[in-house]
C-alpha cells in the first residue's frame, strides 16, 4: 500500500527490491489499477522487460491472473496484451530488444522491469517521448548490478522534483524466511548475496577489493560532500585491478 501511494503521487519512481521480493506482482497490479481508473480516451500501458520472452515468463501469467475477474477483459496471447472493455484501456508486455516496435506509441504509464539490464538510450530516445503527450508515469524496478544506469536513476530520484526512490532489502521486508536467507548466504559469495538480497550497488563490481569497504563507509555515513578548497593540493592514486583483480598498487 505504501509503495502504490508513493507511485501515485510521483511521476517517476525507482523501486529497488531484493530477489523474490514481489516487485513484478506490485508492478502488474499497479498497472491494472491505473488502467481501470484512467479517464482519458484509450489508455495505454506497458510492462517492458529486457527481452519479450523474459517478460512473458515473468509477468504475463500475473497479468492474466489479476485481471481475469474483471468483466469484459480480453486476452491476446500472441501480442501479450490485455484489453479492458470498461474504458478501452490496454496493458501490453513488450521486450526492449525490439525498440523500433515501441517508437511512435503513446503510453499513460510504463513499468521498466530489470532496469539494471536496460540501456539508458531506450528511455532517453524512445520511452520518454512516448510519455510526453499523456504525461505518463514511469516506474523502474529491479535489483542492483553494479553502479550502472539503475544506480544513476536511484541517485537522481533522491533530489529531483516529482521523483521517488526506495530500497527494499531482504533483511527488512521479512518476505523470505530467515533460515532461507542464511542458507543462501552460505551458498553464495558475500558479494553476490549483498547484491541480490541486500540490494548493494557496490557488490556488483566483480573482483574489487574496495567495494565492501565503501559499502561499510556509506552505511556508517562516513562519506560526505565537502566544499572544494582550491588552495589545497589533492592527489589520489588508484589501481582498481579491472583485468587483474590481484593487483593493488
Question: Which sequence ranges carry the predicted segments?
Answer:
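Phosphate/NTP-binding elements of NTP-utilizing enzymes
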Residues: 1-246
